[in-house]
Every structure is written in C-alpha cells, then in structure tokens.
C-alpha cells in the first residue's frame, strides 16, 4: 500500500468536507428569516407583481414619517397619558431584550380601540401616519401595523428585521395586515387582534391562520403568489 498516496487522498477528502461544512454554516447564517412565512415561500416582487395602490400608500406614509417622525423622546405628537407611557417605554427600550421590546410595543398600540378608515378619515382606504393614528387613538389593522413598524425603527430595530405583511385570513374570508419581526429566536407576529394585547406569536405556529399575500419594508417588496381569488376577498379586518 502506498501510505503517502493514501494519506494525501485522506487529506484532500478532509479538506473538501471542511469546505462543504463551512459553506453550509455560512449559508445557514446568511439565510433570510423571511424566505418563508406561514409556510409560503416569498419571491422578490417586480413592478408588475406588486399592487400599485399599496406602493402608492406606502411611499406616501414613509416619506411623511421620514420628513416629520412622530415619536421622538419628547413624544411631541402625543397627549397625556400616552406621552408619559411612551417616554417611559423609550427610556426602558435600550435595556430590553428583543421579545420584551416587541411585547411592550404591541401592548402600547393594541390598547387603542379598532375603527375603520371611513369612520376616521371618510374614505374606504387610508394608510395613516403614526401621528394620525395616535391623535385619533384608534384605527384599522394597517394603522396598528404601520405604527408598530415606525416605533420599532425609532427604537433602533433595523429595517431588514421588519416586514409589513398583507395576509388573508381564511377563517374569516378577509384580508388583514400584521407586522413580522425577525429575532434571534425566530420571526414573531405582532397583530392588533390578539388578547392579551401584548401577545406575540411565532410565525410557524400560524400557518392555518394567515395566508401571506404581499410583504414590504423600506428596501424591498415581496409576493407570495397565492390564489388570485384571495385578492378579491372582503376588505381588511380591523
């Protein structure tokens, strides 16, 4: 037996195995936590795949929040007692772990009652700024979701960990907006309809409750290409 040749082959095989293991570990580390949501695979959406009305509303509210952010440390857009609660939350946020922060933000906004866009703004569909929502102290699912998104951004949560998700709820045959947040313990869903109001839930436990339609943040747009008839469902739940 050629010991030298055998040793060389073993060395090559070992190096290949190590390279493959490193590649697998790197791939796992770089995996997009939002690649699949509620059991459905996400696809980057082009202009033809993403609804124009969603893009229009999102572009407007994003610009408004960037030009005049509502929730600063002085809580200038809030009235008592909301301002005091926000200032307290803002002071504690830096020391909170991820899940405690999500529960706190969920609770802060979910304490407000639900109402429709028609009741608040006299139109069928409106994407409010956080200031609009908090001044009225009520809103529909979009209002809660948008406000939670911008609140978490104000607390330093990066955009790539956040997704606004338009979903379909088959049990109610309606569309509904929620916020998905990536953490070290997985992706959690912030919904205005949950009780207790601070409840956050892992996305993988909600496959039967939500069918994702579209997803967006400041940098991207995604579609899940569900059945077309879901897009013709009733208006969003409040």
Where do the protein language model's features map onto the residues?
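A structural boundary/capping signal
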Residues: 2, 26-238
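Compositionally biased, intrinsically disordered low-complexity regions
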Residues: 7, 18, 236-237
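Bacterial N-terminal signal peptides
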Residues: 13-23
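Bacterial N-terminal signal peptides that target proteins for export
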Residues: 2-14
């Amino acid at each position: 037996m050629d010991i030298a040749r055998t040793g060389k082959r073993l060395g090559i095989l070992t190096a290949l195995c190590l390279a493959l293991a490193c590649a697998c570990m790197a791939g796992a580390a770089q995996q997009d936590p939002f690649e699949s949501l509620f059991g459905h695979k996400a696809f980057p959406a082009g202009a033809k795949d993403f609804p124009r009305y969603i893009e229009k509303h999102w572009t407007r509210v994003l610009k408004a929040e960037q030009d005049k952010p509502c929730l600063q440390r002085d809580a200038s857009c809030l009235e008592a007692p909301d301002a005091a609660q926000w200032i307290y939350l803002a002071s504690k946020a830096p020391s909170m772990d991820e899940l405690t922060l999500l529960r706190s933000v969920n609770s802060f906004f979910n304490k407000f009652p639900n109402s429709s866009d028609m009741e608040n703004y006299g139109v069928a569909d409106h994407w409010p700024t956080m200031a609009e929502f908090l001044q009225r102290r009520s809103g529909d699912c979009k209002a809660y979701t948008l406000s939670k998104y911008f609140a978490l951004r104000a607390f330093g949560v990066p955009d790539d960990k956040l997704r606004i998700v338009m979903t379909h709820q088959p049990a109610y045959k309606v569309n509904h907006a929620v916020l998905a947040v990536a953490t070290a313990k997985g992706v959690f869903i912030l919904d205005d309809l949950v009780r207790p109001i601070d409840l956050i839930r892992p996305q993988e436990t909600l496959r039967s409750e939500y069918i994702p339609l579209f997803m967006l943040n400041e940098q991207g747009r995604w579609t899940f290409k569900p059945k077309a008839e879901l897009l013709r469902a009733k208006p969003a739940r409040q």
